[in-house]
């Protein structure tokens, strides 16, 4: 067994009894002890309860019980998600002693599916940066090069996966916080559609908030393979518990089964965000292969530009972020705006 194996592979080994949940947990704890001092990805551990749950998972498997698709899998979650009984800080010093009384909804779903959540991974202050540092736990380093950042804000999540400290993670994303760390650390990350995964129990907002998601933050998995992302989404996606009577996540079967029957639209690029040659070549190769397989492939323009899309994003982002600013900060920003060039069109200034 290698700690670079995918979560899907490890789950199968657990089911085949090639390794026990207790053994797999200890392998990860040993790995954390060996390399985490240099990476600083895992910042909080819950070893005793994790060992108890791992033993229970093994006993259940021996009796033929099935806890779910993640039965016995040890994993960590971003320190933005409340985990009952474990310090959850959101990277904020004012929450350094916060111990939740209940799980965030994503943690509820993971544990209900059989996962063993044994620790938390580092975040920047309020998950608001593209690096990973806070005053409580310090800086997280990229496991491939300790002098480099893993990105942020789910930098601890991505670094832990890349470093062999956990096989699966759940981060959050508003402006790249899953995707950037996944890219920097060479792992897989997915930002799902808005509200596909419940975000209740994420910090911010403040601890204990039970309100529904009114931001543009989404929860998203990080892993070592695309199959693992699908596995995680099969557990995490769906309506909030308060909405389960209102809708369900059941899509109709696809209208076509053969590739030749599909029409595929390709948006090859946009001047606002030019592609690197290697990426453009890969898209063209994929387009050519689809056409060779009989699909009807057409280049299209969606009717809006990435510049328009970027402006809209920053308007939404600024509105969300500013709601949490103290009045003094808002007053200072207004003063800066008065002194700025009126011809500046950047939405981050407006």
Spans of features found by a protein language model:
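An N-terminal boundary/leader segment
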Residues: 1-51, 292-294
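Acyltransferase
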Residues: 21-26, 55, 275-302, 325-337
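Conserved hydrophobic/aromatic pocket- or pore-lining residues that grip, position, or stack substrates
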Residues: 28, 50, 72, 78, ...
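Long amphipathic alpha-helix in the N-terminal Rossmann-like dinucleotide-binding domain
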Residues: 48-58, 114-115
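Acidic/His- and Gly-rich active-site-bordering loop/insert found
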Residues: 60-135
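Short helix-loop capping/hinge segments that flank enzyme active sites or metal/cofactor-binding pockets
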Residues: 70-90, 258-267, 318-350
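Short glycine/serine-rich loop segments
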Residues: 102-233
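A short helix-breaking turn/cap at a secondary-structure junction
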Residues: 191-281, 285-287, 304, 331
């Amino acid at each position: 067994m290698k700690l670079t194996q995918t979560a899907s592979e490890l789950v199968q080994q657990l089911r085949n009894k090639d390794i026990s949940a207790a053994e797999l947990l200890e392998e990860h704890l040993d790995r954390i002890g060996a390399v985490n001092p240099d990476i600083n990805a895992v910042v909080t551990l819950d070893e005793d309860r994790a060992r108890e749950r791992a033993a229970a998972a093994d006993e259940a498997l021996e009796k033929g019980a099935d806890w779910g698709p993640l039965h016995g899998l040890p994993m960590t979650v971003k320190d933005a998600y409340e985990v009952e009984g474990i310090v959850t800080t959101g990277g904020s010093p004012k929450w350094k002693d916060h111990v939740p009384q209940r799980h965030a909804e994503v943690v509820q779903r993971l544990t209900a599916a059989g996962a063993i959540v044994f620790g938390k991974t580092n975040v920047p202050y309020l998950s608001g940066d593209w690096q990973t540092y806070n005053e409580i736990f310090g800086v997280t380093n990229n496991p491939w090069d300790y002098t480099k950042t893993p990105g942020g804000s789910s930098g601890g999540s991505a670094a832990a996966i890349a470093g062999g400290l956990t096989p699966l993670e759940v981060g959050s994303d508003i402006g790249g916080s899953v995707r950037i760390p996944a890219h920097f650390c060479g792992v897989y990350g997915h930002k799902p559609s808005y509200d596909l995964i419940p975000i209740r129990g994420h910090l911010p907002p403040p601890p204990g908030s039970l309100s529904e998601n009114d931001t543009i933050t989404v929860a998203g998995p990080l892993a070592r393979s695309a199959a693992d992302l699908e596995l995680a989404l099969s557990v995490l996606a769906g309506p909030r518990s308060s909405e389960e009577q209102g809708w369900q996540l059941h899509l109709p079967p696809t209208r076509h089964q053969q590739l030749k029957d599909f029409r595929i639209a390709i948006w090859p690029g946009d001047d606002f965000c030019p592609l690197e040659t290697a990426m453009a070549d890969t898209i063209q190769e994929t387009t050519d292969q689809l056409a060779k397989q009989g699909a009807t492939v057409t280049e299209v323009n969606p009717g809006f530009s990435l510049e328009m899309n970027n402006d809209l994003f920053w308007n939404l982002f600024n509105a969300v972020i500013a709601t949490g600013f103290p009045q003094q900060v808002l007053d200072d920003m207004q003063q800066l705006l008065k002194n700025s060039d009126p011809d500046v069109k950047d939405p981050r200034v407006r």
